[in-house]
C-alpha cells in the first residue's frame, strides 16, 4: 500500500488551476477582461507562488484600473466634443508668435483648481490667436477627472432655442444637464450681435444658474468685454449680468506678435 499523499501535489496543482480558470471565467463574465488576462498570465509565470497578497492584487487590478480609466477618459472626450483636440498645455506659453497675460496663467490654470472652485475663465484675443486651442487643451485635461462640454456659442444658443420652442420639458432637461457639467466651454462668444430675445434669455439662464451653483464656464471671445453690451441688443440688464459673470474671476489675454 502506497500512501495517496504522494499524488497530492499534482492534485493540488490541478485544483488550483481549475480554481484559477473559474476565477478567470468569472472575471470575464463581469467584463473585467484585463483582470482576467492578468490573473491567467501571472498564474502561469514562475513568480506566481512568490507573490504576496498585496503584490498579487496590485498586478491583477492595476491593468484593469488603467484600462477603465482610459476608456472613461475617451468616452468623456467624445461626449465633450473634444476628441482629437490638443492634449497638452505645453504650447500655450509666450513665444515669438504670441504672448499671454498674465504671464503665470499656465501655472494657475493647469492645476484645474478653477474648476473645483467653480471659477469662470474668460479667454480674449483676436481671430486665430490660440483661444480655442487653450480652451480645448484645458477641457481635455479636465476630462480626466471632470465632466466637460465644448460648444460654439452661436450653435449652442440656436440649438437650445429650437429645443425650447419644440419641447419645453426636453429643454428643461437639457438645461439641467448643462448645470451638472463641471466645465462648460463656449467658444466664439458673442462673435456676432444677438438680436433674438430668445437666445439672450437662454444665455442668461445658463450663465446665471451655473454661477449660482459655482459651476465653471470658459468663454472665448475676440471682442473686448466693454463692447459686449452693444452685442446684446434690447436687454441691457441681461447684457450686464452676462458680462459680470463671464469676466468675474479670471481673464487670459492672448496677443499675437507678428
Predicted regions and their residues:
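Post-Walker A helix-loop "phosphate-sensing" segment adjacent to the P-loop in P-loop NTPases
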Residues: 139-151
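Interdomain "pre-motor" coupling segment immediately N-terminal to P-loop NTPase/helicase cores
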Residues: 32-84
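Phosphate-binding P-loop
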Residues: 110-118
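Walker A/P-loop nucleotide-binding motif
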Residues: 118-134
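Short glycine-rich substrate-engagement loop in P-loop NTPases that contacts/grips substrate
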Residues: 100-106, 149-179
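Loop/turn-to-beta-strand initiation segments
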Residues: 146-147, 180-183, 211-219
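N-terminal pre-Walker A segment at the start of P-loop NTPase domains
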Residues: 87-110
